[in-house]
């Protein structure tokens, strides 16, 4: 499942942008929150689609990675999820940068993408961890009561 997800992300972020046309290098953004601010301004000016797709899309696309990592290793730590998510996103951004410099892609390296993608991974981690916690709590509450607790319920 993780391999299929990785291939899908690679296709979405790299392969879908490759064409036979030589492209100009777009550049890079190394200033944190600059792109996010510009998308928020677009949103405020009524450009809902572009702003939403870019901000929400960068987050949502990486939620499955956080989910999959927790499912593969239920004891994985938040810090490790953060590092894996950041590095996964960093590799994609570096590939986009290198392929853009070689005029194969017209994508850019954007530090805000690293932030948004990592947030997506962390949301996936928190979702699965939260659901697991609730399932355990419900299971414990319903099925693992002591005989004394069960007898008290019967008397009520």
Show which residues each predicted segment covers.
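Bulky hydrophobic segments
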Residues: 1-107, 122-156
